[in-house]
């Protein structure tokens, strides 16, 4: 009887500890570009023309060829191509301060490309106001981005978002975004380059 009581207490303690861990994981996000969100607001409100090629996923054979090209670049070559901030963010996995990036509050329609290799990554129609101070999107363009496990913060595993072509660090993705994907791709402005689109003429 005593053994059964001790087992019940141990099980209850384990469930309680796991609940506290989940709570901490959710509430400690604000300092790492991953604050819980209120109702997101889509930032693309006007109808604009869009060429199909500008926001299309790259074919696998094209991606592979470009991967080989960019994989051969040395760190010094990247430094020559990028500004110090761009290099820090994309090649050293840095994070810009919230509410300081060029695109965090941008409502300009267009396609956001990788600043390193010009691969189209996100369409402005998937951009929304996350309230975090970083540009946020709910869906990438095709397979032009990929994710991998980031264990750089102890007890807080995250999913890093990188360019599928040149492996540039873009930001992180979280499961608190809007419909239809429920994803929030929280990115650094310095990793992006906006190709703005012109209004459709009547």
Curated annotation (Swiss-Prot):
Gene3D superfamilies: Peptide methionine sulfoxide reductase. The active site is at residue 186. Keywords: Chloroplast, Electron transport, Metal-binding, Oxidoreductase, Plastid, Redox-active center, Transit peptide, Transport, Zinc. One of its GO terms (molecular function) is metal ion binding. It catalyses: L-methionyl-[protein] + [thioredoxin]-disulfide + H2O = L-methionyl-(R)-S-oxide-[protein] + [thioredoxin]-dithiol. Residues 48-67 are annotated as: Disordered. Pfam families: SelR. InterPro entries: Met_Sox_Rdtase_MsrB, Met_Sox_Rdtase_MsrB_dom, Mss4-like_sf. One of its GO terms (cellular component) is chloroplast. Expressed at low levels in stems, leaves, floral buds, flowers and siliques (at protein level). Zn(2+) binds at residues 114, 117, 163, 166. It comes from the Eukaryota. Its EC number is 1.8.4.12. Induction: By photooxidative stress. Changing residue 116 to S: Decreases activity 2-fold. It is found in: Plastid, Chloroplast. Belongs to the MsrB Met sulfoxide reductase family. Lacks the conserved cysteine (here Thr-132) required for the reduction by thioredoxins (TRX) through a dithiol-disulfide exchange involving both redox-active Cys of TRX and MSRB. Reduced by thioredoxin CDSP32 which regenerates MSRB1 through the direct reduction of the sulfenic acid formed on the catalytic Cys, without the help of any other thiol compound. Also reduced by the glutahione/glutaredoxin (GSH/GRX) system via a glutathionylation step of the sulfenic acid and then by GRX reduction of the GSH-MSR adduct. Catalyzes the reduction of methionine sulfoxide (MetSO) to methionine in proteins. Specifically reduces the MetSO R-enantiomer. Plays a protective role against oxidative stress by restoring activity to proteins that have been inactivated by methionine oxidation. May play an essential function in association with MSRB2 in maintaining vegetative growth during environmental constraints, through the preservation of photosynthetic antennae. MSRB1 and MSRB2 account for most of the leaf peptide MSR capacity. This is Peptide methionine sulfoxide reductase B1, chloroplastic.
